[in-house]
Amino acid sequence: MKRRLTHLFLTLLLLAAALPVSGQGKIYTRKMRLADFPTKTTKIVLEGHSFLELALREEIAVHWRISPFEFCDLEEYGRLRNSSSYYFLTLAQEDGLAYLILAKGGKPDEKDQLRKPFEVVRMPIASVDNPTGRELVFMGAFLDIIQRFTEEALVSDKVAYAGLESANRIHLRGRTVYLDPDAGDEAYLREEPGALLTISIAPEEPGPKTVCYKILISADTHELLSFERSRYKEPDDARFSDAEARRFERRGATVIR
């Protein structure tokens, strides 16, 4: 039922996008608002020398390919963040988790919808207080996931509104899921074709309002194939369950437990 309601909402939204709105002009969908991305410079915001920032700086130079980019510090970011001439990739922390966030700059009170700021995609990458070190190894994969999503959102409002969860519809036939992190890491490092590894990202301590993420990515192409966000009330919430393994199997994968 939830999926049907979401599909109906998106359909109505896309239909409404073409209609004029009295006193406000045209409604622009997320795809329309993102259309200028390939021609704009993406500012990579870095300040300091944390392991995450060092890894991000190194992997950006290798992996970023979908727009011009420049590095900037927090001072420059403060000056430019209200300009719709730039997109920004930032490292942010929220409720015990670290994220990579790609967002368009602009003034919040801007009347022109095409010049208003908005968040394109938010990728969880690590626990702030209990990092595993895997986030450094997978930084290139996280950047590839952000770029692949952005490319798909440029041509599909369905993807743009669904967010990273849109990956949950992809068939897994002919692929192998490694639930064991060590086995998954080895497959990732050797870029094993058809291998999928699991990544769990959770705050140091569970709580009534905290969340965790469980992610499935391909070892060779870094394609995102499952993205689940859930409440993190106890440690088991961040572990891949037997029920999730069965869901992967129903999508066609072979699961190695």
Feature names for model-found ranges:
Residues 1-12:
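Bacterial N-terminal signal peptides that target proteins for export
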Residues 24-35, 109, 115-257:
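C-terminal/domain-edge helix-coil "capping" segments
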Residues 10-11, 21-26:
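Cleavable N-terminal signal peptides
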